[in-house]
Amino acid sequence: MFTKTQILALALSIASAEAVSKGFNYGANKPDGTLKVQADFEAEFRTAKNLETTSGFNSARLYTMIQGTGSTPISAIPAAIAEETTLLLGLWASGGNMDNEIAALKAAINQYGDEFAKLVVGISVGSEDLYRNSEIGVQANAGIGIEPEELVSYIQRVREAIAGTALSGAPIGHVDTWNAWTNGSNAAVAEAVDWLGFDGYPFFQNTMQNSIDDAKALFDESVQKTKAVAGNKEVWITETGWPVSGDSQNLAIASVENAKQFWDEVGCPLFDNVNTWWYILQDASGSSVPNPSFGIVGNTLSTTPLFDLSCSASSKKNSSSASASASGSSAQSTGFVSTTKPAASPSGSSGLGHGGSLGSSGSFSGGHYAGVGSSSVIASPSATPSGSAVPGSSSGPGSSSGSASGSSSGFGSGAAADSTSGTSTSGDSTSSTSATPADFTGAGSRLSGSIFGAAMLVAALAVAL
């Protein structure tokens, strides 16, 4: 017979698990560079929810609000509605296209209404813009970035755009590398957001001992540095992963075996405990294979992954300590940090812009991984919002670096990629308070419902006892 205390703990555990976002990053383009349509997103979201040996990944982080060009809302939105996949929205901030990004956001709210709003767990204004604007980003040809002051103005514009709408309470954040967050010159950005998104890739920390056996320690250290500047704000894990194939980075070897180890040691403690968007479900198709390639399903979109995704009890045993190390003010959100990969573009598929940026689909198509400083970082593989291999500069949708993060509960943890001196990173202050799930439509209402349901279960069982 269970005691009331045990029942309460179980119910709250269930409610907490339901509140945490667990998903992948999704670019706007396919691995071959062509634009994804609604059916493509639906197929990806459906696959992620039904991956073998998992409980399903039902959240999606986007890099852009735009479908191709202009200001038409991205087709990932109706796909998410059809597949009941939560969304961490992304607006591509570099390249001067913010007017169209905001117009697309407003259009999506008007067109899809509450069906859309209830799925939104957060909004990311920009992705690795501060890294690309830094000395290290420039040396690595990571693509076009923006100054922190301009990014702050964009964040304010997005707040104004959603005021009075179904998304009026959605928490707004920014995604960047950890060294961008810890750079005091970027402090204004940390002050302006509700949560900090962390992109971290120990694989690319090529000036350090970065073998797969060192990866977890590097990741955890980066998270702690990001958390230190986050104050009482949430840190969301918006991008991390280990490549299944491709060239080595110092001691880091790309292989299915190592990707599995990274999944077990870094991913499993995060999943269902911290808002996490993994990089990536698929970034290769046919002959279009980026170097390195991070896709866990290989060249074919299938629910059968390249390696076992199940998380054993031993791999999850450190989940509570992992959560504690990355969370800002809430026990639910934890963050881990590691270095970043090459830069990205809003297209979001394998396609590094000529600055070493990737397409948001998560593959690389050019650019190089220049290591600068004692612990230099490479921009993330998702550097382009399109999500597919899209060559060109990272200045606009489909050309810049793309990384985004989201969480089904509206709270999660993130970490920025690791790199030390010479990059422009913003130090977070403890100024604004993270929005609570109850403060916004969508994930907040689901979270409230989850907790309410758990409370009802507790009450009913308590009476029965």
Swiss-Prot record:
Membrane topology qualifier: Lipid-anchor; GPI-anchor
Intracellular or extracellular location(s): Cell membrane; Secreted, Cell wall; Secreted
Catalytic residues identified in the record: E128 (proton donor), E239 (nucleophile)
Induction info: Expression is under the control of the nsdD transcription factor required for sexual development. Transcript level is the highest at the beginning of asexual development and decreases thereafter to increase again at the late stage.
Record lipid sites (GPI-anchor amidated glycine): G442
SUPFAM superfamilies per record: (Trans)glycosidases
Glycan attachment positions: N183, N318
Catalytic activity: Hydrolysis of (1->3)-beta-D-glucosidic linkages in (1->3)-beta-D-glucans
EC numbers: 3.2.1.39
Gene Ontology cellular component annotations, sorted alphabetically: cell surface; extracellular region; fungal-type cell wall; plasma membrane; side of membrane
Keywords: Carbohydrate metabolism, Cell membrane, Cell wall, Cell wall biogenesis/degradation, Glycoprotein, GPI-anchor, Hydrolase, Lipoprotein, Membrane, Polysaccharide degradation, Secreted, Signal
Keyword Cell inner membrane annotated: no
Biased composition (Low complexity): 320-333, 380-438
InterPro entries: Beta-glucan_modifiers, Glyco_hydro_17, Glycoside_hydrolase_SF
Single GO MF annotation: glucan endo-1,3-beta-D-glucosidase activity
GO biological process terms, semicolon-separated: cell wall organization; polysaccharide catabolic process
Residue ranges the record assigns to the propeptide: 443-465
Signal peptide as annotated in the record: 1-19
Pfam families, sorted: Glyco_hydro_17 (PF00332)
Highest taxon, organism lineage: Eukaryota
Entry similarity comment: Belongs to the glycosyl hydrolase 17 family.
Described function: Glucanases play a role in cell expansion during growth, in cell-cell fusion during mating, and in spore release during sporulation. This enzyme may be involved in beta-glucan degradation and also function biosynthetically as a transglycosylase.
Name the record gives this protein: Probable glucan endo-1,3-beta-glucosidase eglC
Originating species: Emericella nidulans (strain FGSC A4 / ATCC 38163 / CBS 112.46 / NRRL 194 / M139)
